[in-house]
Structure formats: structure tokens, C-alpha cells
Amino acid sequence: MTTMTRRELLKASATTGLVLGAPAILSAQSKAPINIGTLCPLTGAGGSYGPDMQRSVVAVVERINKAGGIHGRPVQLFHEDDQTNAEAGVRAARKLIDVNKVVAIVSTWASAVTLAVKPLCVETQVFLIGVSGADAVTQGDHKGYVARTQPNTKLQGSMYAKFVVSKKEWKRVAYLALQTPYARSFGDAFNGIVRAAGATITDDLIYEDKKPSYRSEVTRILATNPDLIMLEGYTPDSVVMAKDIYKAGFKGAILAPSFAVNAKFIEGAGPDVAEGIWNMDRAPLFDSPAYKEFTAAVPRNDTSPYAPQAWDQISIVALALAAGKGEASGTVIKDNLRAVANPPGTVVYSFAEGAKLLGEGKKINYEGASGSCDFDLVGDILSAPFAVQQVRKGKSELVTVINP
């Protein structure tokens, strides 16, 4: 696997965006480029995922430009690191919007970042699409300029709960979550379904970030005698929390999001602490032609859903622009989003397939590497299967897939 440093990733910006597709641009494209920005977390808590997300976008744009671009115009990429930090994300978004004049920003990760840059995008009519889960991302009057490929927290909470209630030995469940924009809405959805199924929520605790120890929180949770701890945090805090839970002698089960329980988590927590921890996230469409093309183009060491979602985000944005009449703007993207991503229409798995049919005046339905990308009226995806994994001998292994 070829890896890129943060410096190398950030150098893949304005000039690189053109160079990547240079042969196609020189031979088939003479019009002004369409500027699109990425705002991935190359550093910070999401730094495990941002580089692969960015590589995915670059790979798709290479293909778009080799196929002749969008209405004969090449796509030019501009990359910024949001640092998994809202303030840094706003500064980066302002640069993309004001200096680079992008029509879309793709692949934001943390909900706090997406929520911070959302008003800027709505005000300037720049289309924003990311993988953030907080319900607030698509709430309010965003005028259609915001969408996501990651399930919202209500859908996530319900899918986690569906798995939990299938395990009859988990009768007593404690909810333990980092203070984030999604913690409360996820917990409400999760706890409600678990209770309705007859299990007991023994405690519901939201904890602060960046504490050197969570012994007091662990003591409180374990005093309720749970069979399962639903741990909803990011990787850094989850490492500290899992260590403290292990040291306290907890013999029950832990379930967490896969974006927290990743290779860095296993390395940081250690194999003994990590062993047996369950984790879940959206399942890619493993058998899809789009997923197969994605895996060949973006080799990586994990199966997290964010890189394939980034692949789909740039594909959908490009197809929405192709469905327009030549104008490239955030408004064209939001007006054509569902026309290219939702049924009815011929199922397509790539920009080249879709652009060809659109050019023939036909309807299309993009199915991507991450699965179906069917959006409701507020920009949420309608449904998604979830992969259930468990850490076994130092690696997260797929156990089953839970369907809606």
C-alpha cells in the first residue's frame, strides 16, 4: 500500500488537480475548469480517515477528467485539512470559497466541522456533502445545499439498537458517550429502542473530552451492573475509557462505532484491552462494481465506510453537474442531486456510465461504492445496512451485516 504524508496530500491542490487529469484535459478539454474543494480531516481525531477520503476523491476526478470532464470542462481540486476542528474547518472553508471559488465542498467528517461550515456554504450557495452523522447537519433551512452519505444519528442509533436487542444476553445496557453534536440524538434513538425491546438502560452518561482518566465515569457506570456498555466516542477518548474499563475488571461486552475502534485504537489500547470489543458502522456495498473499482483504485488497510463514501460524494456531485445544462454551480448540484442518485432510472456505477446516459437524455440512478445513495428531501440517505465487527487477535473482523 502506498501512503501519503500530510505534506504530500496538501500539495495535491490547485496545480495537482489539473496535472492529475492533464492528458485528458489537453486532448479533450479546453474550457475553464470546475473548482471543487475537499475538507477532509488529515489530522486530529479523524486523521485516520481523511487521507483515504482525499485519495478517493482524487481517484474519481482522475477518471472524470480522462472521460472528458463535465460538459468538456475538467475538474480542478483544492484540498484543505480541517484538523477535525471546527475553527480550523471554518478557516479552510473560507479559503476554498473565497479564494478558490469552489462550487462544492466534499468529504467533511466530524459533525462539529460540518455544522460550523454549513452556514458559510448555504450563504454562498456552495454545495456541501460529508459523512457527519449529527441530526442537526441536515436540519434547518439549508435550502438544499447540504447532504450526507452517512446515516443520521437516529438511523445509526436504531441500527445499533437492532443488533443489541438481537443478543439476548444483553439485558442491562449502559450508554456512555463523548460530548459531541450527535451524542444526545444517537442516545435517544438507541435507548428508546432498547427499552422498548424489554432491556434496561442502567445509566446514560455524557462525558467530557481530553481527560487523562475516566475512572470516576467508569465507577459510576459499573455500579449499575451492565451486561453491555454502549461507548460512543472518538478514538483518543475511547482508548482512555476502554483502558479504565478494563482496569476496573469489567467482564461484560462493549459496543462502539467502528470510526472509534480502528487500528489506532487497537494499537493505543493494547491487544488485551481491545480484544472482543464489538463495533459497527455503515456497510459498503461489497459486491458492487463501484466498490470493486474503488478498492482497486484506493488500496488501504481497513474497511471503514468513509473513503467509499467520499468516492460516491464526488461522483454524485459530478453527475449532478453533468445533468445540468452546462452551468457549474452549487445550485445546479442541489437541483439535480436526486435526479442522478435516486430511482427511477438506469442503475449506473460510475461517472462515465452516468454521463453517457445523461448525454442521451436518459434518467440514471447512481449506486455507489458505499451502497445506495438515495436522498430524502432534507439531504439524508433513506437507509443503509450496517457492518458488525469484533476485535479478534488485534484486528476487527466482520461478523455480520444488519439490514434496515
Residue spans of the language-model regions?
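Extracytosolic ligand-binding ectodomains
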Residues: T2-A12, T16, G21-A22, S27-P404
